[in-house]
């Protein structure tokens, strides 16, 4: 597949997602990094977003809850180039009914080459990166060329 460049803006659009057993871990992480996160645009699946907003007072664009389609909504935003970073604390020790949605979300984040953290250590590395508040170029699939080739 041919690639093109997308610029992640200095003011990032960050998706926050956490499975039930990981919500408190994400809440603690958000509270610890609140001053920095407040400079960006936040999205989250339903329950997680409402919990974050209630605990911190931050504005969070809440989707549906993950099992009700929220993971897929976040995935769609990634595909549309509207999410720049995914922080997704998922529970690897407990299966969830919407496991296919979880796999699809992680697959889309990989396809569209956005930074992804699935644990606290990686989330800390991302948010503490010297480039976190900078505009950064990433390579993404050239969808227009892909579509043109498919329609030949």
From Swiss-Prot:
Top-level EC class as recorded in UniProt: lyase
InterPro entries the record matches: Methylgl_synth, Methylglyoxal_synth_AS, MGS-like_dom, MGS-like_dom_sf
Active site: 71 (proton donor/acceptor)
Residues noted as binding substrate in the record, renumbered to the chain: 19, 23, 45-48, 65-66, 98
Family recorded in the similarity comment: Belongs to the methylglyoxal synthase family.
UniProt function note: Catalyzes the formation of methylglyoxal from dihydroxyacetone phosphate.
PANTHER family reported in the protein's UniProt record: METHYLGLYOXAL SYNTHASE
Name the UniProt record assigns to this protein: Methylglyoxal synthase
């Amino acid at each position: 597949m041919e690639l093109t460049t997308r610029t992640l803006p200095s003011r990032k659009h960050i998706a926050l997602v956490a499975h039930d057993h990981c919500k408190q871990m994400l809440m603690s992480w958000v509270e610890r990094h609140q001053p920095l996160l407040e400079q960006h645009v936040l999205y989250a699946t339903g329950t997680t977003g409402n919990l974050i907003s209630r605990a911190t007072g931050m504005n969070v664009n809440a989707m549906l809850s993950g099992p009700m389609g929220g993971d897929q909504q976040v995935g769609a935003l990634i595909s549309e180039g509207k999410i720049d970073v995914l922080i997704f604390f998922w529970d690897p020790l407990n299966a969830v009914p919407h496991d296919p949605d979880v796999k699809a979300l992680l697959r889309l984040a990989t396809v569209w080459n956005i930074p992804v953290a699935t644990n606290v250590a990686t989330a800390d590395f991302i948010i503490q990166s010297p480039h976190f508040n900078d505009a950064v170029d990433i390579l993404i699939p050239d969808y227009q060329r892909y579509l043109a080739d498919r329609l030949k």
